[in-house]
């Protein structure tokens, strides 16, 4: 059957919400059931989980180009549908200088890269509600890594290979072109069978991204449909694609492919056996070199924590790694990148002057019940961080360009007398003795506490006395330093605590009322340096809707 005939039976392109192509079929998902009183014998109509689907066997007459034309029509309609959701809703929890979505749900940063004298950053977005569903990519640009400008909704879940979500991936700057690699997610049938393909897109002269379709359609042997989040690098004279994967034994591993042209990929092997049973799935891989060492970053899921306060299965890790002349990868030594409540799916980019800068999602996959949901949005990205490899450790430092947002320094005496900062956007730098407790974002009822437990040499972050609705409330970090040096970046509803010059970091969403701007220190009296942080440019398409 011709595709035009099927579209006519479907009631026209405007009645088509998705296109699928499972196992030699063409399936059109419809807003409304077709009006045709009698369908041809080779066309079936069924309701699949409340969605009407019209399907027919795919013949040689139906080309990929024809399917792509339907995908483009759906994409244009999807982009128009996001326009009302590109207006930021006013909210006391909205950050002043972090990236947040105007509405809906933000998750992983994607495609973080320096290309043709500009920084590009994308993020996963579901515009219509605070839920994980049918992911889009938002495109931002910056000249300085501080002030980000909304460019477009770059990718939408419009095609047969990504109909249920444009999942995470990375960008490649090659010659004059900016390429995007991502995982296309589809769900098929009443059992919502997952089907994943690795896909590519390329930016055209108008700054729009044209999908090139799947570049890897089939699963490698021994892997489930949970294989995603491509990271593409150029090494040893060829392109390599790194993917987070799950084996048939439900163990997380790193899947590696190679290519000569970015379009045709060949599977090499799975890596990570030396870690044994290290989670049931690995997500969001990144790979980079720093001071002559190679590093592998990923999100292992299902690792048990030794601390009873840590109940979340979604973890973050960085491993020192090696790659020999044959391309074989070995994972040597690993650590958490962040010890706080809300940090996942980080990506890194190399700046124009050679620094390695990290951006993460300040959230977790299972958290969808924050107070900001009452105002129609959830989650934000972390502050950008510079990475340093020194004395066998990874150190993280706030991006130096953030200093341009700082006020003049103020000396602040921290004591048990509450000082009103009258803001939740600041940079606090202080060295504390063991045996004291710092309270932040404080009023008579709410606060977050940072306790320096002298007996156990534990730094304890406690957000149980906040408005948090979901997630853990205590994090603990073992330290052996004689004092604890802190740099705390605060922004309305978040804290990023850099400990002992960035040897450790604790990143957390902290929700307290608008008037909870007090700070106090109990058990000691110490001078601190305080900078107020000015707002960065809003990363939205339109003005804030008050």
Curated annotation (Swiss-Prot):
It comes from Vibrio cholerae serotype O1 (strain ATCC 39541 / Classical Ogawa 395 / O395). One of its GO terms (cellular component) is cytoplasm. Belongs to the glycosyl hydrolase 32 family. NCBIfam families: scrB_fam (TIGR01322). This is Probable sucrose-6-phosphate hydrolase. Keywords: Cytoplasm, Glycosidase, Hydrolase. It catalyses: Hydrolysis of terminal non-reducing beta-D-fructofuranoside residues in beta-D-fructofuranosides. SMART domains: Glyco_32.
């Amino acid at each position: 059957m011709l595709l035009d005939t099927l579209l006519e039976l479907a009631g026209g392109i405007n009645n088509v919400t998705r296109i699928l192509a499972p196992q030699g079929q063409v399936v059109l998902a419809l807003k409304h059931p077709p009006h045709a009183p009698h369908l041809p014998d080779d066309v079936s109509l069924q309701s699949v989980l409340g969605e009407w689907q019209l399907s027919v066997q795919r013949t040689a007459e139906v080309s990929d180009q024809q399917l792509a034309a339907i995908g483009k029509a759906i994409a244009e309609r999807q982009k128009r549908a996001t326009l009302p959701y590109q207006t930021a809703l006013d909210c006391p929890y909205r950050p002043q200088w972090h990236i947040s979505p105007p509405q809906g749900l933000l998750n992983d940063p994607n495609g973080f890269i320096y290309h043709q004298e500009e920084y590009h950053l994308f993020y996963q977005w579901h515009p219509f509600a605070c839920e994980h569903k049918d992911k889009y990519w938002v495109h931002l640009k910056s000249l300085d890594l501080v002030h980000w400008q909304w460019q477009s909704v770059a990718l939408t879940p419009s095609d047969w290979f990504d109909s249920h979500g444009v999942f995470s991936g990375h960008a490649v700057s090659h010659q004059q072109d900016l390429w995007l690699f991502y995982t296309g997610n589809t769900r098929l049938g009443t059992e919502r069978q997952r089907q994943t393909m690795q896909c590519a897109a390329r930016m055209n002269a108008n700054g729009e991204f044209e999908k090139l379709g799947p570049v890897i359609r089939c699963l490698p042997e021994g892997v489930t449909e949970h294989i995603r989040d491509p990271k593409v690098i150029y090494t040893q004279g060829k392109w390599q694609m790194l993917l987070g994967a799950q084996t048939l034994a439900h163990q997380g591993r790193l899947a590696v492919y190679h290519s000569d042209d970015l379009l045709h990929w060949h599977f090499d092997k799975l890596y990570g056996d030396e870690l044994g049973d290290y989670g049931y799935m690995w997500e969001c891989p990144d790979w980079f070199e720093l001071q002559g060492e190679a590093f592998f970053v990923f999100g292992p899921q299902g690792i048990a924590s030794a601390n009873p306060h840590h109940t979340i299965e979604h973890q973050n890790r960085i491993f020192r790694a090696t790659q020999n002349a044959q391309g074989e990868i070995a994972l040597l030594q690993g650590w958490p990148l962040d010890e706080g409540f809300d940090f996942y799916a980080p990506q890194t980019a190399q700046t124009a002057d050679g620094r390695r800068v990290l951006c993460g999602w300040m959230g977790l996959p299972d958290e969808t019940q924050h107070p900001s949901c009452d105002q129609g949005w959830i989650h934000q990205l972390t502050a950008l961080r510079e990475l340093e490899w020194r004395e066998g450790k990874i150190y993280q430092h706030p991006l130096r360009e953030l200093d341009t947002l700082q006020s003049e320094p103020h000396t602040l005496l921290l004591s048990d007398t509450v000082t009103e900062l009258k803001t939740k956007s600041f940079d606090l730098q202080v060295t504390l003795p063991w045996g004291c407790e710092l309270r932040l974002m404080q009023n008579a009822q709410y606060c977050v506490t940072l306790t320096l437990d002298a007996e156990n040499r534990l730094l304890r972050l406690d957000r149980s006395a906040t408005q948090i609705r979901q997630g853990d409330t205590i994090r603990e970090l073992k330290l052996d330093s004689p004092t604890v040096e802190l740099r705390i970046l605060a922004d309305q509803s978040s804290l990023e605590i850099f400990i002992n010059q960035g040897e450790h970091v604790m990143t957390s969403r902290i929700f307290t009322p608008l008037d909870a701007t007090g700070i106090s220190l109990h058990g000691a009296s110490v001078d601190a340096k305080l900078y107020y942080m000015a707002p960065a440019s809003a990363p939205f398409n339109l003005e804030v809707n008050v």
